[in-house]
Amino acid sequence: MDNTQAEPLVVAIVPKPNASTEHTNSHLIPVTRSKIVVHRRDFPQDFIFGAGGSAYQCEGAYNEGNRGPSIWDTFTQRSPAKISDGSNGNQAINCYHMYKEDIKIMKQTGLESYRFSISWSRVLPGGRLAAGVNKDGVKFYHDFIDELLANGIKPSVTLFHWDLPQALEDEYGGFLSHRIVDDFCEYAEFCFWEFGDKIKYWTTFNEPHTFAVNGYALGEFAPGRGGKGDEGDPAIEPYVVTHNILLAHKAAVEEYRNKFQKCQEGEIGIVLNSMWMEPLSDVQADIDAQKRALDFMLGWFLEPLTTGDYPKSMRELVKGRLPKFSADDSEKLKGCYDFIGMNYYTATYVTNAVKSNSEKLSYETDDQVTKTFERNQKPIGHALYGGWQHVVPWGLYKLLVYTKETYHVPVLYVTESGMVEENKTKILLSEARRDAERTDYHQKHLASVRDAIDDGVNVKGYFVWSFFDNFEWNLGYICRYGIIHVDYKSFERYPKESAIWYKNFIAGKSTTSPAKRRREEAQVELVKRQKT
């Protein structure tokens, strides 16, 4: 590993807005950039630097150890055409068999915490206790957690990362039924009993917005409803699914707080995701569109957890298709978390959309907003592979400030932040490990987090997505997010330059950026050639 000492990289972030800025004026937060040097010492001593992965994306061993099938097993195997390369997570990156080696790499990289999910169908193959507990699956997670702890890495556990047991989907439609609330609560309680004395950070759901929209409005994720298919109703089902997720979250948090939190001394929250929505112009209609867009993505979940009901804009536009909370549920939802995890990848411009004349209603058009990555023919940020992600570090800053000011969230973690790149299969390993752009990405986003902290947002951790290259849902293996390169055929792991940077950053060392180092090496080589 290269531990060359050098001047730290200078990156650009947004300046601090006026502390009195109201959330209704979030579009006024300036985006002019200033320069700042990012160090480990800029963050609080108890700030956690980690990385993440999830069960279906990493474990593999889909039919080993008495694991039951999940909806992602069914989706990928029955509908391979919906995956970009026709692949699946049957083997994923083989973490089930390689976890000890993987955790050794985590320790070498200096991770302070690793965020992972439990496969519901690996511990409860039939989805509930009455259908039987899988002792092999329970042992695997005990061994995995124990190995993390033995290596000084804090486990951060997600209970649901989209891989619902197929048994519950078959029995009653999974999250389309209110019955899921009791079954999820039972599963959560089982995990609290089984693993809770070792876990200090619990997350009920990861990105419920993605699960509800991609799985029930677009048909691109399991269980594949909505979209162009005949199954599902994209005007109703995403709202029903989200409603049941919120009630299941509430039930699990109540269970943890009432029975476990005092003795286990852990925290429990939920991980949400949102793009930052920037008004396309200063016209009031676009400013209003910004608020609606944020309501429909972030407020859909945070408003009930703050006020006990959905955003006013959603009530007005979705009307009777939006479920209602009982008075008791509404009251108990308020403050039903210890922390909020925020997954951030990109930002977009938004403008007011003309109401669709289409007779087919959908969540996708209910907000009456048009999104675009360009303004005056200039992109909002550098476009990455696939075109959906643009590098917009200041969007993370604005999102954190907006979340704190609008919803008064006391504790935030950036639970995912990462950069997509193409899986280039015909390049040398040495080239595949060169990812200076990823290092630059994380430097700039960490700078935005630091600036948000300076402005009073209580951010307590940053988790790189992802630690390993892995199976990326409907994109299969055509792209990579990891700071550790994985050979998808041999499963060999190799640290990328970004992993070496992250190791040194966490350790508080100054490092030459990979791009700068290569420029210096090229300059030395040029001088040598000139002398000869």
Curated annotation (Swiss-Prot):
Leading EC class: hydrolase
Biotech relevance: Ajmaline is an anti-arrhythmic alkaloid commercially used as an efficient drug for the treatment of arrhythmic heart disorder.
InterPro entries according to UniProt: Glyco_hydro_1, Glyco_hydro_1_N_CS, Glycoside_hydrolase_SF
Cited PROSITE patterns: GLYCOSYL_HYDROL_F1_2 (PS00653)
Catalyses which reaction(s): 3alpha(S)-strictosidine + H2O = strictosidine aglycone + D-glucose
GO molecular function annotation: strictosidine beta-glucosidase activity
Result of altering E416 to D/Q: Loss of activity
Binding site for a beta-D-glucoside: Q57, H161, N206, E207, Y345, E416, W465, E472, W473, Y481
Tissues showing expression: Mainly expressed, at low levels, in roots and, to a lower level, in leaves.
EC number: 3.2.1.105
Effect of E207 to D/Q: Loss of activity
Record note on what altering G386S does: Reduced affinity and activity
The protein's annotated pathway: Alkaloid biosynthesis; ajmaline biosynthesis
Keywords: Alkaloid metabolism, Glycosidase, Hydrolase
Gene Ontology annotations of biological process type: alkaloid biosynthetic process; carbohydrate metabolic process
Catalytic machinery residues: E207 (proton donor), E416 (nucleophile)
Region called Disordered, residue ranges: 512-532
Family membership: Belongs to the glycosyl hydrolase 1 family.
Name of the protein in its database record: Strictosidine-O-beta-D-glucosidase
Lineage of source species: Eukaryota, Viridiplantae, Streptophyta, Embryophyta, Tracheophyta
